Amino acid sequence: MKTKKFYQHLYFQVLTAISFGVALGYYLPDTGTAMKPLGDGFIKMIKMIITPIIFCTVVTGIAGMDDMKKVGRVGGKALLYFEAVSTLALGIGLVVINIIQPGVGMNADVTKLDTKGLDTYTATAAKGHSFVDFVLGVIPNSVVDAFAKGEILQVLFFAILFGLALSAMGEKGKPVYRLIDEVAHAFFGVVNIIMKFAPIGAFGAMAFTIGKFGLGSLTKLGMLMGSFYLTCLLFVFVVLGTIGKLCGFNIFKFISYIKEELLIVLGTSSSESALPRMMAKLENLGCSKSVVGLVIPTGYSFNLDGTSIYLTMAAVFVAQATNTPLDLTQTLTILGVLMLTSKGAAGVTGSGFVTLAATFAAIPTIPVAGLALILGIDRFMSEARALTNLVGNGVATVVVSRWENELDVARMSQVLNKELDEADGEADLLMMDPEPEEA
């Protein structure tokens, strides 16, 4: 296989684009702000292809299973893992923010805060986040509506039903199975084309962020940001690193393997932007297609570790900054509410702040107006959230695959140790043939 030069690799191109975006936004803020359509356009192209890929991957994965009980088993194990690890993330954020206490001494007066920028978030949060609303929201009004609006959980729900129905058809369902499998190849080919524009999207998104908010806004609440970034690093390398070690892989090698996806997320602040490539990478790593198809899409609502850390830290920070005392009962109440509201967040920019607003609305102890304190820097913390979310969902997929004995451990070792050509993480990875499955 011909070795690419360093400047031909996607990770180098994206990293360079991010650097130019930061420079443009800093020195020419108005021009940088005008670059926003570039980032928005790239994310829209990715979102355009996400739901068809999820549908095809989940349908072929389920229809290819010989044992239909496996679907429920994989889903159950995934949800068990999601709940345990995301709750651990909430707890870690709670412990760190109470140890460092970055909000103590700010003495912010909520009556004097500018809350105009909160209107959009509080209005969205007010639409309802009850458990019943969440469950009903998973069921689409129509299949076309779910695809048109890009509702991942709704598409996942329909794909599971369709896959089960296709499997029940037996031999009669094989032609449809093969057709959907070929369509999936075509969609991944589209992703391969879209990823050529990743550097442009990362450049536009970063130029806009720096141009609009400025590097100066990073220093005003730097202690909170520093605490959050530190907690995310500890979570990834200590918690996920330990989980990875128990499953037979090194977290540093895993992160190196998905470096291109991480850089795309860094540039766009949305873990969804790397979803198609992440699914292909995990299949290439040795995880079965059926497990990848179920775990990754579900994880984008149930396993957002970075968002979980952010939610507890931001909530307690606002309480500290506004001199709102929290006793043990109130703190545990916040943790309990966040265990529910955090499951409704999506892996898109700004969703964490909407979830936080919904949580504050459910907990009258903390003033909603206090959110104005962190509105200005929320955009800068979204990168760490998205990166942690991506790594967390990747690790979750490997773990569930290992639990199900659906992980090719030997291949994973070869890929992570760069003993296979595919481990280079090149763009043509998305065009590879999937593992063989029986229809």
From Swiss-Prot:
Function: Responsible for the transport of dicarboxylates such as succinate, fumarate, and malate from the periplasm across the membrane.
Alphabetical keyword list: Cell inner membrane, Cell membrane, Membrane, Symport, Transmembrane, Transmembrane helix, Transport
Name assigned to this protein: C4-dicarboxylate transport protein
Record flagged with keyword Cell inner membrane: yes
Single GO BP term: L-aspartate transmembrane transport
Localization annotation: Cell inner membrane
Provenance organism: Geobacter sp. (strain M21)
Gene Ontology annotations for the cellular component aspect, listed alphabetically: plasma membrane
Topology versus the membrane: Multi-pass membrane protein
SUPFAM superfamilies, sorted: Proton glutamate symport protein
Main location group: membrane
Positions of transmembrane segments: 9-29, 45-65, 80-100, 150-170, 186-206, 221-241, 291-311, 334-354, 357-377
Keyword check for Metal-binding: no
Lineage: Bacteria, Pseudomonadati, Thermodesulfobacteriota, Desulfuromonadia, Geobacterales
Family of this protein: Belongs to the dicarboxylate/amino acid:cation symporter (DAACS) (TC 2.A.23) family.
Signal peptide per UniProt: none
GO MF annotations in UniProt: fumarate transmembrane transporter activity; malate:proton symporter activity; succinate transmembrane transporter activity
